[in-house]
From Swiss-Prot:
Keywords: DNA-directed RNA polymerase, Nucleotidyltransferase, Transcription, Transferase. This is DNA-directed RNA polymerase subunit beta. The RNAP catalytic core consists of 2 alpha, 1 beta, 1 beta' and 1 omega subunit. When a sigma factor is associated with the core the holoenzyme is formed, which can initiate transcription. It comes from Hamiltonella defensa subsp. Acyrthosiphon pisum (strain 5AT). GO terms for biological process: DNA-templated transcription. It catalyses: RNA(n) + a ribonucleoside 5'-triphosphate = RNA(n+1) + diphosphate. Transmembrane segments: none annotated.
Length: 1341
């Protein structure tokens, strides 16, 4: 296996037994690909912006004398880059420019004669762009658009499961769901009549829609029923016989021909009888007259002599009617064939309840249902019906809908029109009647073949189309207004509605969410999330148990583990590791193809629909060396069930054991030994881990850590290979390899690193280089670690030495006892960055001013501010300190004569302004790390703003100069090579300044040309440098675009150092969470025989009932990994020979049974071995993939190699007494996370604070500076104790007795500790409520 530069430094020993057939795909592709399709120009015009434009344009005027046509579009360049947008609070977007053509036709001339054509490019608003990490920057904050899982368009057959009607009868229904347009529902009622609903409105008999489609009663009966022909001859009645139709019926007369009785009266007709009738080729039989009575005629019958209608189609025959027909000379009578078994008379019955008789009355009935209260006209009724399902503007099934529709109706063709046809509606009815007759099955709505993914691109396209449709109306009006000779396309289009629609979607849609940026995993999970909520989806309240449940089709597509606990459980899911979407938006997962029992490496992606037809083996099925199944019977999945199949029957095999889980769950080692409920908590809690000060890779991982860290985009990854030219804390420069360079470029890549920036969750984002000068890197190698990454691997927490034992009750109820050493070594210290903003506005009384001259504030409070009134960078501030001094003008107050006199004597002038400075929130002590000032255009900048500007310009100039220097050096290197090859010695060159080299003449023409080309490049480079500098200077010095009425914004960034303390929440990766109960001195912690104390003591009772045994196995394996690290460390200390070191490390890597990934250290140089050993001395890193991890036996082998007891338990001694504990204790290394539930953010106490407006009771919650609720049950407690005075105090002066609490405050100030309780305000509220009901209550003194 080839290792990258960073991987060589620390290789994970992999315990996986199965080879990786398919690489893990790029984890953010679902977001990036979808958005790419949206903005990419699609020549077919089936998706993206192109599709939206083509669906709305051309727009014709009402008179059709002019039209506006769409030609093409282009996206411009964004004004600010991503970083600048975040700092300025802007949206990262590009202007959309559309080329439109205005065509005016001659009114008098023949149709289509063009009078005038004008073409122009029109600005159509801004389109937010996706960053390379799959996010959007909207108003300066990073947001993610979550994909939605919604019901696919198409036709669905379902039933009410017998819940609607009291009899428990199952009522079937069909629903045609378009991508956009009206829904069409067909449903049976308890009397078996078929009804239709349009858009869930009032129901109508289903035959109304058939009549509206211009079918007569006879046509309808011909469509849905087979016919039976009766003939009257010689006063006898004969019937044309189709023997199969008699099956299952009870004969009401003897069926006999020529004296031979086939079926006796009263007997049921069986298959044997039918075979006999077929054999004897019986086609007609005589039936008694009673047999035809009650049958329904299939057509109209007219008396040919008089032209009078005897009976219309769908009339039941009676004796009288039969006599009439016979008299009128009708010898043949056709009836419809129905029976109680499998040919129900539902349509015939429905026709009887249908009040309409012809097309017009049907259209009028539909119009009345859709538009109640409006008078119907023929034209209006026809237009309405036409627009419902047959107009491309109003109705679209979409390609997906048509494909699902045709598949459901078992048609061969899967493409077709986006609107419905007559045949479509009739076939849906036929299938629904077939299901009612017992043929066919209903659909499963929760099957992933019936639910599809709607990603960012598609949702943005829909929003954009909505905006365009709004514009279309306005354009139509303007085209019809006349005077088109002077108008240009620009005058037709108002971009506001389009911008508004797009802005609304990205800014406030339920699916456009504030990105969870706690750590790299939470980012990646958020982008791979799939929600069933949102517009056009489900709601929490209505979603039942079935929708939330794990469905067999989730396998390999949606993770069965990772979903939130609480009301959203099962509605918000996560994409599985290998899952992706197909062209129709259905989820697919990869499988290896199997031919005659041999598994190949050919990969096929199957969707849930296709998957059902195949037999699929699991990834852990045993194969021999040639890829054949070893066992004859293999556990496989087929049609959602698991069972044993012969190996020849297998069609496909899973790609990987981690195929079924999501990224979050695939990071939990020994997941297969954890209960699913705890695994769910573990996967969710990893997302809440706060990045620690120094990231520490997990000793026991799953091998997914590198993929997550690299794909999340928090690390800095080499775009092209080359050698490292320069490294410092904030920038890396790489000289690109010759073969990866573009022609004519200098071949230098410069990476500027993120330093101490704030994330959405206030955690700290900081990148640290992990390469050295002069080293060779390849494309895709990690150059710098981001937050929570260590050498390019995800590192959410710290490896801690844990012991499972009780310790003086400090680990009661999942509490955690932590050693003081953890705090001293800053293992779980985190940095939080808070942003505080001070806004200076223009008020009615004058503008607010940022200044250090604040009334009634002492010198001490101003000590950390500069002369502009803004805090210094580096100042250490505490709660209540002023960060930005600001004064607000206040209205003049009327002064008393005494005050005027004092004012005159002491000359206090600052009375007309009040202090409104920005202060540090209570309870925060922090360091100021950055200040940014934004000033409105046209407002004079203060001194501090100019200083900051100057500093930024200097920094930019320095950056660009260094960039230029590096590029120049590379270019002059190439110039030197040309000159030397042209015969000039390097000595001569060293005497001349570099710029002069370009003037040197060369004898060879080819060399001279090369030199001139390079000289041109040099001039271009300098010009480019000047241009870049000018652009940056303009951006920095121009005024900022601030909200109306805002003059200036000062943003102060504070860094808060959070050490671990009692009350903080910690967790492992297996759902084992707890709160720190005590930080214990190191000397009191339990220690082993060598005197090494443990770091954390966990409760052993947290394991058995929770059934997350994975944590115990992780602890044992962690102990073994650390033990091997210790042995390597000892060897390094003794300066052992490299060959011995190599041999020991090789032995550790080779351990295990049938491990597929072996490491060959013989290819490593001695230097690389030492570098590897240096990284392994703190513990050997191990990967145990999900469902394919280390076995107990292998853990024991590793413990043995590390000279540790194979039980995984050791004797511990009490740190306080030195006595040995009576039993050996499980001790090992577990990966612990500190979660973003810090006690500092939760701890809160209230002094006098805010009160509710109506009830005058104190508010609740930390954000409102509220108190603790003294609720109903607490009142009962005081009543039970008989503490009357305490109770009175609680319910009056401490709560809502306004006068009482004011009086009490005065009393306390006066030193008088008495209270007088009055009437609580809430009692007055009650009185008012009662009065509002018209009952007057008055209180007597």
């Amino acid at each position: 296996m080839v290792y990258s530069y960073t991987e060589k430094k620390r290789i994970r020993k992999n315990f996986g037994k199965r080879p990786q057939v398919l690489d893990i795909p790029y984890l953010l592709s679902i977001q990036l690909d979808s958005f790419q399709k949206f903005i990419e120009q699609d020549p077919k015009g089936q998706q993206g912006l192109e599709a939206a434009f083509r669906s709305v344009f051309p727009i014709q005027s009402y008179s059709a004398h002019s039209e506006l046509q769409y030609v093409n579009y282009r996206l411009g360049e964004p004004v600010f880059d991503v970083k600048e947008c975040q700092i300025r609070g802007a949206t990262y977007s590009a202007p959309l420019r559309v080329k439109l053509r205005l065509v005016v036709y001659e009114k008098e001339a023949p149709e289509g004669t063009v009078k005038d054509i004008k073409e122009q490019e029109v600005y159509m608003g801004e389109i937010p762009l996706m960053t390379e990490n799959g996010t959007f920057v909207v108003n300066g904050t990073e947001r993610v658009v979550v994909s939605q899982l919604h019901r696919s368009p198409g036709v669905f057959f379902d039933s009410d499961k017998g819940k609607t009607h009291s009899s428990g009868k199952v009522l079937y229904n069909a629903r045609v769901i378009p991508y956009r347009g009206s829904w069409l529902d067909l449903e049976f009622d308890p009397k078996d009549n078929l009804f239709v609903r349009i858009d869930r409105r009032r129901k109508l008999p289903a035959t109304i829609i058939l009549r509206a489609l211009d079918y007569s009663t006879t046509d309808i009966l011909n469509l849905f029923f087979e016919k039976v022909r009766f003939e009257i001859c010689n006063d006898k009645l004969e019937m044309n016989l189709v023997p199969e139709r008699l099956r299952g019926e009870t004969a009401s007369f003897d069926i006999q021909i020529n004296g031979k009785i086939y079926v006796e009266k009263g007997r049921r007709v069986t298959a044997r009888h039918i075979r006999q009738l077929d054999k004897d080729q019986i086609q007609r039989i005589e039936v008694p007259v009673e047999y035809i009575i009650g049958k329904v005629v299939a057509q109209d019958y007219i008396d040919e002599n008089t032209g009078e209608l005897i009976c219309s189609a769908n009339t039941e025959l009676s004796f009288d009617l039969l006599a009439k027909l016979s008299q009128a000379g009708h010898q043949q009578i056709e009836t419809i064939f129905t029976n109680d078994l499998d040919h129900g008379d539902y349509i015939s019955q429905t026709l009887k309840v249908d009040p309409t008789t012809d097309r017009l009355s049907a259209l009028v009935e539909i119009y009345r249902m859709m538009r109640p209260g409006e008078p119907p006209t023929r034209e209006a009724a026809e237009n309405l019906f036409e627009n419902l399902f047959f107009s491309e503007e109003r109705y679209d099934l979409s390609a997906v809908g048509r494909m699902k529709f045709n598949r459901s109706l078992l048609r061969d063709e899967i493409e077709g029109s986006g609107i419905l046809s007559k045949e479509d509606i009739i076939e849906v009815m036929k299938k629904l009647i077939g299901i009612r007759n017992g043929k066919g099955e209903i659909d499963d709505i929760d099957h992933l073949g019936n639910r599809r993914i709607r990603s960012v691109g598609e949702m943005a396209e829909n929003q954009f189309r909505i905006g365009l449709v709004r514009v279309e109306r306005a354009v139509k009006e303007r085209l019809s207004l006349g005077d088109l000779d002077t108008l240009m396309p620009q005058d037709m289009i108002n971009a506001k509605p389009i911008s508004a629609a797009v802005k609304e979607f990205f800014g406030s849609s339920q699916l456009s969410q504030f990105m969870d940026q706690n750590n790299p995993l939470s980012e990646i999970t958020h982008k791979r999330r799939i929600s069933a909520l949102g517009p056009g989806g489900l709601t929490r309240e209505r979603a039942g148990f079935e929708v939330r449940d794990v469905h067999p089709t989730h396998y390999g597509k949606v993770c069965p583990i990772e979903t939130p606990e609480g009301p959203n459980i099962g509605l918000i899911n996560s994409l599985s590791v290998y899952a992706c979407t197909n062209e129709y938006g259905f989820l697919e997962t990869p499988y290896r193809s199997v031919h005659e029992g041999a598994v190949t490496n050919e990969i096929h992606y199957l969707s849930a629909i296709e998957e059902g037809n195949f037999v699929i083996a699991q990834a852990n099925s045993n194969l021999d060396d040639n890829g054949y199944f070893i066992e004859d019977l293999v556990t496989c999945r087929n049609k959602g069930e698991s069972s044993l199949f012969r190996k020849e029957q297998v069609d496909y095999m899973d790609v990987s054991t981690q195929q079924i889980v999501s990224v979050g769950a695939s990071l939990i080692p020994f997941l297969e030994h954890d209960d699913a409920n705890r695994a769910l908590m573990g996967a969710n809690m990893q997302r809440q881990a706060v990045p620690t000060l120094r990231a520490d890779k997990p000793l026991v991982g799953t091998g997914m850590e590198r993929a997550v860290a690299v794909d999340s985009g928090v690390t800095c990854v080499a775009k092209r290979g080359g050698s490292v030219q320069y490294v410092d804390a904030s920038r890396i420069v790489i000289k690109v390899n010759e073969n990866e360079m573009h022609p004519g470029e200098a071949g230098i890549d410069i990476y500027n690193l993120n330093k101490y920036t704030r994330s959405n969750q206030n955690t700290c984002i900081n990148q640290i280089p992990c390469i050295n000068l002069g080293e060779l890197v390849e494309r895709g190698n990690v150059l710098a670690d981001g937050p929570s990454t260590d050498l390019g691997e995800l590192a959410l927490g710290q490896n801690m030495r844990v012991a499972f034992m009780p310790w003086n009750g400090y680990n009661f109820e999942d509490s955690i006892l932590v050693s003081e050493r953890v705090m001293q070594e800053d293992r779980f210290t985190t940095i939080q960055i808070q942003e505080l903003a001070c806004i200076s506005r223009d008020t009615k009384l004058g503008s607010e001013e940022v200044t250090a001259d604040i009334p009634n504030v002492g010198e001490a409070a101003l000590s950390k501010l500069d002369e502009s009134g803004i805090v210094y960078i580096g100042a250490e501030v505490n709660g209540g300190d002023i960060l930005v001094g600001k004064v607000t003008p206040k209205g003049e107050t009327q002064l008393s004569p005494e005050e005027k006199l004092l004012r005159a004597i002491f000359g206090e002038k600052a009375s007309d302004v009040k202090d409104s400075s920005l202060r540090v929130p209570n309870g925060v002590s922090a360091t100021v790390i950055d200040v940014q000032i934004f000033t409105r255009d046209g407002v004079e900048k203060d001194k501090r703003a100019l200083e900051i500007e100057e500093m930024e310009l200097k920094q930019v100039k320095k950056d660009l100069s260094e960039e230029l220097k590096i590029l120049e050096a590379a270019l002059f290197g190439r110039i030197k090579a040309v000159l030397i090859s042209g015969g000039i010695t390097s000595e001569k060159l060293s005497r001349l300044p570099c710029e002069r080299w370009l003037e040197l003449p060369l004898s060879e023409e080819q060399k001279q040309e090369q030199l001139e080309q390079l000289a041109e490049q040099y001039d271009e480079m300098k010009a480019e440098f000047d241009k870049k500098m000018e652009v940056k200077r303009r951006k920095i010095t121009q005024g900022d675009d601030l909200a109306p009425g805002v003059l200036k914004i000062v943003k102060v960034y504070l860094a808060v150092k959070r050490q671990i303390q009692p009350g903080d929440k910690m967790a492992g990766r297996h759902g084992n969470k707890g709160v720190i109960s005590k930080i214990n001195p190191v000397e009191d912690m339990p220690y082993d025989e060598e005197g090494n104390p443990v770091d954390i003591v966990l409760s052993p009772l947290g394991v058995p009932s929770r059934m997350n045994i994975g944590q115990i196995l992780e602890t044992h394996l962690g102990m073994a990994a650390k033990g091997i690290g210790n042995k390597i460390n000892e060897m390094l200390k003794k300066n052992e020979r490299v060959s011995k070191l190599r041999k020991f490390i090789q032995k550790a890597y080779d351990l295990g049974d049938g491990v597929c990934q072996t490491v060959d250290l013989s290819t490593f140089s001695d230097k690389e071995i030492l570098s590897l050993a240096e990284n392994l001395k703190k513990g050997m890193t191990i990967a145990t993939p999900v469902f394919d991890g280390a076995k107990e036996k292998e853990i024991k082998q590793l413990l043995k190699l590390a000279d540790l007891p194979t039980s995984g338990q050791i004797n511990l001694f009490d740190g306080r007494t030195g006595e040995q504990f009576e039993r050996p204790v499980t001790v090992g290394y577990m990966y612990m996370l500190k979660l973003n539930h810090l006690v500092d953010d939760k701890m809160h106490s209230r002094s006098t604070g805010s009160y509710s407006l109506v009830t005058q009771q104190p508010l609740g919650g930390k954000a409102q500076f509220g108190g603790q609720r003294f609720g109903e049950m607490e009142v009962w407690a005081l009543e039970a104790y008989g503490a009357a005075y305490t109770l009175q105090e609680m319910l009056t002066v401490k709560s809502d007795d306004v006068n009482g609490r004011t009086k009490m405050y005065k009393n306390i100030v006066d030193g008088d500790h008495r209270m007088e309780a009055g009437i609580p305000e809430s009692f007055n509220v009650l009185l008012k409520e009662i009065r509002s009901l018209g009952i007057n209550i008055e209180l007597e003194e």
